[in-house]
Amino acid sequence: MAAAVAMRGSSSDGGGYDKVSGMDSGKYVRYTPEQVEALERVYADCPKPTSSRRQQLLRECPILANIEPKQIKVWFQNRRCRDKQRKESSRLQAVNRKLTAMNKLLMEENERLQKQVSQLVHENAHMRQQLQNTPLANDTSCESNVTTPQNPLRDASNPSGLLSIAEETLTEFLSKATGTAIDWVQMPGMKPGPDSVGIVAISHGCRGVAARACGLVNLEPTKVVEILKDRPSWFRDCRNLEVFTMIPAGNGGTVELVYTQLYAPTTLVPARDFWTLRYTTTMEDGSLVVCERSLSGSGGGPSAASAQQYVRAEMLPSGYLVRPCEGGGSIVHIVDHLDLEAWSVPEVLRPLYESSRVVAQKMTTAALRHIRQIAQETSGEVVYALGRQPAVLRTFSQRLSRGFNDAISGFNDDGWSIMGGDGVEDVVIACNSTKKIRSNSNAGIAFGAPGGIICAKASMLLQSVPPAVLVRFLREHRSEWADYNIDAYLASTLKTSACSLTGLRPMRFSGSQIIIPLAHTVENEEILEVVRLEGQPLTHDEALLSRDIHLLQLCTGIDEKSVGSSFQLVFAPIDDFPDETPLISSGFRVIPLDMKTDGASSGRTLDLASSLEVGSATAQASGDASADDCNLRSVLTIAFQFPYELHLQDSVAAMARQYVRSIVSAVQRVSMAISPSQTGLNAGQRIISGFPEAATLARWVCQSYHYHLGVELLSQSDGDAEQLLKMLWHYQDAILCCSFKEKPVFTFANKAGLDMLETSLVALQDLTLDRIFDEPGKEALFSNIPKLMEQGHVYLPSGVCMSGMGRHVSFDQAVAWKVLAEDSNVHCLAFCFVNWSFV
């Protein structure tokens, strides 16, 4: 109340007058400038001083001797309120500016759509009139609809000719960015709003594939243009961008001849390149424009020898329109319009080159997200772990991704060459003798003997396997496919100057992996993390040696709401974190071939119960498993890199080939386990072998809870078994069931339980009860076991447990009870963790 009174009576200049509560309504305290300065110094160090601190202030500052302690208290209250008001006012002004800009953007989009509707109505009326008046003149009625061919390539050595092409490119680009040159439709799954990446649209019925995005970013136009022109920094598929010629143009603009190389997304298709003209200029209203188009469909650019591994693609007028925004920031329009020569790839992979949605996700929205990411980092909104600078972590992500792309594409000019196989063409082995791994201690030393890198890679088609589900499983359950000794071999190459196979000691993976988050993008489409794999020595002598392995890992598309065009898990062993750490990238990439309109498959979770809506009604589950999920096709690419010494080249190649084959087999097993068509048919039996069906278990859990505790677990416990199962599955607290054995293993969990453990029903059996509790939790549990056996239930105090990924989870209370079967024998133990959350 005193603060409120003080606020009403305070001056707005920060400290002239203060009205003291409890005093006369007309009595104010006037502070001298010296007194205000002294109080401001204290406020800067401690905005909310205690009573003793205020008393100390009066003693130490004679200038404040004539002010009562109560008046000092009110001054600090008043000062805090003014500070809070200023911050809130600043925040609201920023929000208002953003909403004003978004409103302007939406009004412009609405105006463009109205023009498009008018144009379509006019064309429709014209077409109807033609059909009515000239029914027999079909051969001539279409002449007006023939698309005007692209202008032929003019003399590239003639600057005036290039400037003319640049102006034409600018006009065509603007007609796409803000006009109706292309019939744009909103991309499915993208909902515009203040928190969205922007307004995203894809082409309908035009030549090639095209995408358009517009959004608001908190960066100045010149900075936005600088970032967007540096395409390799944000477009992960861009291998190289080289400017061959630069010609000055009017308004301080430039015309450039640019050669761009793209990576191949998989080993099954060739890479693409572009030979383009890029025009940068300033508009009359102060907007900046960067527009670009191919100079020709083929020919031009570097020599044929350097481009022999590429298919020349065509860029139709595309680019960026960046307009300054009142109050700071920019409104950005991005258009990508390409002809990717889909004829040159196998038919099954052509959707990758014929889908405008793929272009929107890989290029257009990627550019907008990258700008937003940098804007948030610049403003200090993003704070990363371990004190790392955002730019440094972003560099690590780029290096991981680039190394993986290099391995998949295997360009000759990078030193890659194909090695002979063993007669079976399932795994491709490539060798690069020019690529060296340098030690940290001496950057001039690579290996003790000449060597290089061997890459084993394979691609396979997957049917009915949701990509995000597969990548999440590979990330969370490395022991299902990885060989710890191979990881140890790769890690050892960073610590020693020799890559020896015989020097490795056999080790066993303990099954424990700790994931430490480092950074993530704005919408969590990319996550950078460190993974620690705990090794288990086979002999007592080795127990004293540290055998843990650390991996730097980049995950793409594993978020529940991901609707991306590529899902990746890329990693490399690391020994330290200096900027020059060598990264030998390996991993997996899954690319959907059937781009669905609703993006539902990637939001599916790993648990089998979700495909049932949970329960034993397998017939319903089989029917409910989306037909899109069951027919979903994708291509999986696997690439693993191995350093070698020259005299061990053949041995490392054989090891690499066999290792990748074993990974392919493991992925095939996992794919069958998580396929919706399989889970729908067998989910009732798959909850665990020899276990009762889920509906029966749910009934036993609820009945036993009521029997032991005297209260109902669920609000409606008198429904049928399947209804109970659905309610138990969606219950707010985590419910876990474990076997009633000497070493209890988890056998079932509801959705909250799986979220808490960060696992799935497929991998739940890998977790034991003792693994999730810390030491105090284990002591509390073990000390209460006699009580649990005697009375059938026990309450555990609040504490901390561990998820399957090694994260700490706090809970307010836990309840454990015995689950009785029909014959009244103990079938399993059940736990309920109340109000759990990640620490």
From Swiss-Prot:
Record CDD domains: bZIP (cd14686), homeodomain (cd00086), START_ArGLABRA2_like (cd08875)
Tissue: Expressed in stems, leaf sheaths and blades and panicles.
Region of interest called Disordered, as start-end residue ranges on this chain: 1-24, 132-157
PROSITE patterns hit by this protein: HOMEOBOX_2, START
Subcellular location: Nucleus
Chief location: nucleus
Keyword Endoplasmic reticulum on entry: no
Keyword Transcription regulation set for record: yes
Coiled coil ranges: 91-134
Keywords: Coiled coil, DNA-binding, Homeobox, Nucleus, Transcription, Transcription regulation
Residues annotated to bind DNA: 24-87
Annotated InterPro entries: HD, HD-Zip_III, Homeodomain-like_sf, MEKHLA, START-like_dom_sf, START_lipid-bd_dom
GO molecular function, one term: DNA binding
Induction and repression of expression: Repressed by miR166 in the shoot apicam meristem (SAM) region of developing embryo.
CC annotations in GO: nucleus
Annotated START domain residues: 155-383
Function field: Probable transcription factor.
Family: Belongs to the HD-ZIP homeobox family. Class III subfamily.
UniProt protein name: Homeobox-leucine zipper protein HOX10
Organism: Oryza sativa subsp. japonica
